[in-house]
């Protein structure tokens, strides 16, 4: 992330970069040092009228670089998360930016499984035998509704667009230990309560890459002209190359790894 996407961070290893966030665990800042969340609290019209139906800013965007496989995990629905965690649940999508040869990820189950078998496989560390292991290539997209068991595996880099939430229930972590030398906490009880035990559904969001109540994602290449009307902001994430962004008479340079927040009702951008 540092070398290819220009991420500046003291974290080591650097596995994630939150590039559009109003979440307190990793807030985004404007160039003048103002937190994006504070700016939107003072200027709610900048987020757009569609955001008024949400108690909190609805979206969080990040880069993820899985140098090692991420824990097998699940995210709860809004209903469960608001009741038990006091924040939103998490529906998300992944867009594969790069991957090593032979890379794959886990995406739900390869067949329907009973709760009893699932509990047994978690206990005896055979969970991966029934997961849907999907080979990946650059440009692949995966839509992951809340309740879907999933994991990004070693050698995959993705852009993730998700609900504004940081609730994760881990069910398997490959026996790894944390910095304190102890196994990282699992959340099996909660995971069993929210998990879908069936194969993932197929989704076709054409002409969009992904679309749900919380976000719409498109991929554009080369020149692009668009507008942000009063209904919603536009977030631009540069995943390849470099160029120029013009909006409101101002032109700025844009390069791989940059993230731009275009306020609702902004003038055309190029």
Annotate each PLM feature.
Residues 1-113, 168, 173-198, 217:
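Transition-metal
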Residues 56, 64-69, 78, 88-89, ...:
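Ligand-binding loop in jelly-roll beta-barrel domains
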Residues 61-62, 70, 92-95, 133-134, ...:
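His/acidic/aromatic-lined binding-pocket segments of jelly-roll/cupin-type domains
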Residues 111-124, 230-240:
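Short, basic/aromatic beta-hairpin or loop at an interaction surface
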Residues 122-130, 141-143, 149-200:
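An exposed, glycine/acidic-rich loop-and-rim segment of catalytic or binding clefts
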Residues 131-143, 247-265:
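Short acidic-glycine-tyrosine-enriched beta hairpin
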Residues 183-233:
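Functionally critical, mid-to-C-terminal surface segments that flank or help form catalytic/ligand
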Residues 225-226, 241-246:
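Short beta-strand segments in beta-sandwich/barrel cores
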